């Protein structure tokens, strides 16, 4: 037979998309063993196979007879023939289909079983198991997306009027709360959308990957609770719930309005700590944000008789919130600002590390001018960071607020206070709860400063008592305290008091006049005294004490509490301890005042007695 030297035939991949690499491998092996010599092509017989199958047959017949190679080639040909028959059969079925539903059914069956026959029982069980398993994996890995998808389906299938009429979402929320300890039949959950036909009260928020709840109203007559939420964003995670961290992870609340009984709220949070289902939902919240909210806090059960406390939250951002560490997590907030009866308060973290680094750098600059500041900055920063890592200081400041607003005189602790203003400044050092320390070593240090102004007192009928009913001081011990506070205002600066009253009177006259003008005058000492020479008031105090804040009493105290005791369930014990510390400091101030008055009286009496003896002595000599 004539042997011809030809080029190696190249079989392109599009001709044999499934098994072309096997044919190419066999061709290259044969050509390598025969030094590039191949047999001439044999004219294929007529067949109905497509061109690519005929080409494959032609190249396969050019190889020598080998049992192993022949078996592999026959298998390849069988696979190609079967796939070609399946493709032609699928095309014929799709051509006979009349509508989209039949074509979708054919394509779905072809993907699952590569045929158009009915599903067998084994195939149905396999498909169902894979479908359920995929939904479970989706629910665990991305719970928020899973719930958002089904909310989208419900909102698309049903009209909003039908959802509001049947109260589908209200029933869903009440079903989630039905097994809680404090939940009862009096709890009302409603939605108040502006347009019931178009507004989605419960819908997915795809941009923030959260669940959006709009216009939610919660009311409970027994708990004296009536709150309205503009909208809430929730993130849920079944993975965290399985790990025991709670189902709800992130919460963003915007626009809370309503009233709330403070004592009932504290009891409600305390009861949640022993509720297993509540802990499963709200055990640990990673990120909590509250913005633009205003709540009227009722501080007693007889809320209709006592005025409410307007508590506004401008911005609150918590890295986490735990029911068993509610107070410490609030004090660990990133930002917390608001107002209490229009008196601003702010909670912020102090920059201890930066201050310490600056102080160390200043000391080193003064010590030596030839100093490498860069290396020392890094060393100081590492040192300070290592020292202050487990602890951080938070400052809480509340501007001057009326005592009647805080209800200091409402309970039995300060029942002798009648009126006045108070400013609170507290530096709180909290041990980092994530540090590797035992629970006994985690503590909180509170350095409290209370500034009282314009206090007015009255003598009570009963002595002040703590929340446990124990007496703080007796009525006899309370008398010097009341005497000191009542005499402190007139004793501190009587001339300034009269001057400030005259100034307020003058300003009131100017303000009531139709021609109003604002004159900003620079404060300075008066060139001439405004008091007549025959006045009995002392002018020296007017020059020595020009400030009008002389009528202020500053109380300081420090308190150390374990983080395990810093809970809402122990809030009365914490307030009792702060009250006792304030009474101790106030008693010291009164004792110093009595000692000073006694010394002044003794000096004045001694001077008067000596002068009288001197005068009588001179008179006797004359």
Curated annotation (Swiss-Prot):
Main location: mitochondrion
Protein topology in the membrane: Multi-pass membrane protein
Keyword terms of this UniProt record: Membrane, Mitochondrion, Mitochondrion inner membrane, Transit peptide, Transmembrane, Transmembrane helix
GO annotation terms (biological process): intracellular monoatomic ion homeostasis; mitochondrion inheritance; mitochondrion organization
Transit sequence range: 1-70
Mitochondrial matrix side: 71-123
Mitochondrial intermembrane side: 145-601
Subcellular locations according to the entry: Mitochondrion inner membrane
Segments crossing the lipid bilayer: 124-144, 602-622
Record keyword Transcription regulation present: no
Cellular component terms per the entry's GO annotation: mitochondrial inner membrane; mitochondrion
Function: Involved in the organization of the mitochondrial membranes and the global structure of the mitochondria. Also required for mitochondrial distribution and mobility as well as for the maintenance of mitochondrial DNA nucleoids structures.
Description of how the protein assembles with itself and partners: Interacts with MDM31. Participates in a complex of about 175 kDa.
Other remarks on this protein: Present with 10400 molecules/cell in log phase SD medium.
Family affiliation: Belongs to the MDM31/MDM32 family.
Protein's name in the database: Mitochondrial distribution and morphology protein 32
Species assigned in the record: Saccharomyces cerevisiae (strain ATCC 204508 / S288c) (Baker's yeast)
Lineage, top ranks: Eukaryota, Fungi, Dikarya, Ascomycota, Saccharomycotina
